[in-house]
Amino acid sequence: METPKPRILPWLVSQLDLGQLEGVAWLDESRTRFRIPWKHGLRQDAQMADFGIFQAWAEASGAYTPGKDKPDVSTWKRNFRSALNRKEVLRLAADNSKDPYDPHKVYEFVTPGARDFVHLGASPDTNGKSSLPHSQENLPKLFDGLILGPLKDEGSSDLAIVSDPSQQLPSPNVNNFLNPAPQENPLKQLLAEEQWEFEVTAFYRGRQVFQQTLFCPGGLRLVGSTADMTLPWQPVTLPDPEGFLTDKLVKEYVGQVLKGLGNGLALWQAGQCLWAQRLGHSHAFWALGEELLPDSGRGPDGEVHKDKDGAVFDLRPFVADLIAFMEGSGHSPRYTLWFCMGEMWPQDQPWVKRLVMVKVVPTCLKELLEMAREGGASSLKTVDLHISNSQPISLTSDQYKAYLQDLVEDMDFQATGNI
């Protein structure tokens, strides 16, 4: 008979009580707060002992068999975190994973007595919460099959409750009915340089005159008709105003802005940022706004400088805000870039009064937000990830959040210089 997969919380409490895994320990006498080592797998000083808790859970859950399967620390850690994500009786109390000397996370049980509750082997209900497996009438029969024994620490008054293995039954797990999560983080493929696609929309005095969606692995350039087409970055030519505007003076001014673009405004992705650089004479200001309007009631986020690159979007805070959004923050992260060409940013005027406004939407970021909205706050919902030239991947909301958390950790690790 196949051994049933253990539930994460009773298993974790037992590991904490045993105290045999390096760095895994209770932090208070009431045993409600505990620490888990959280070192990045690519650190130069990383050793297998640093990932003992993740490997132990991988073995206990049947995801890894020593000598048979290839060790995969990142997958072990992601599966462990995904299992904890859907436990409402737990919360992350402190994230010290960036500590250069002792990277770890602190968790705590948020409900008084929850630690003892999960130790009794409570099973999850359909909402991811905990419920007792037996009614009060059946409690005497339940305790007949239990052996009460002291904890390893003889000075403690707590008692460990160990069930007779023959009495254990496998608990239903919604993840058993879903597609298994891919070993590699699929979000890295979605955000790979060759996957960056941009939806570009241009407005002349508030009127939409151009929209195009295009793959730009090396970046793009917003240009007029006089640009050098042999330069790097894919040229996106803004249309002549003649066929769109009736006011002769406005057409003339728009034409001057387009001519002043020269070799264009370049936008490209490198590392975890989007970068912009102005190659012509026309000044340009940028801001992160909503997809339907540029939030012109405030000042710009910055100016695009001539012949000097500058970051206009950072993926790290976007992903962090996306995780917070999934956890119920209510704040939807922004990803739409607006550029005002040839004039000051419309801080005190309606944006539709500006001669040339260009909106750029990275479609991969839009898709990430849509996936978060589809999953919502429910760990039981699934989201489909669509990547070019591949089959859609179905993920639970918890798996999706775990992959996002992986991205944040990787970006933090790269930002600290690979300690």
Swiss-Prot record:
Pfam families: IRF, IRF-3
Diphosphoserine modified-residue sites: S379
Xref: CDD domains: IRF
Keywords: Acetylation, Activator, Antiviral defense, Cytoplasm, DNA-binding, Immunity, Innate immunity, Isopeptide bond, Mitochondrion, Nucleus, Phosphoprotein, Transcription, Transcription regulation, Ubl conjugation
Chief localisation class: cytoplasm
Activity regulation comment: In the absence of viral infection, maintained as a monomer in an autoinhibited state. Phosphorylation by TBK1 and IKBKE disrupts this autoinhibition leading to the liberation of the DNA-binding and dimerization activities and its nuclear localization where it can activate type I IFN and ISG genes. Phosphorylation and activation follow the following steps: innate adapter proteins, such as MAVS, STING1 or TICAM1, are first activated by viral RNA, cytosolic DNA and bacterial lipopolysaccharide (LPS), respectively, leading to activation of the kinases TBK1 and IKBKE.
Residues annotated with N6-acetyllysine modification: K359
A single BP term in Gene Ontology: programmed necrotic cell death
Outcome after substituting K70A: Does not affect acetylation by KAT8
Null mutant phenotype: Double knockout with TREX1 does not show a visible phenotype.
UniProt family annotation: Belongs to the IRF family.
Name of this protein: Interferon regulatory factor 3
Native source organism of the sequence: Mus musculus (Mouse)
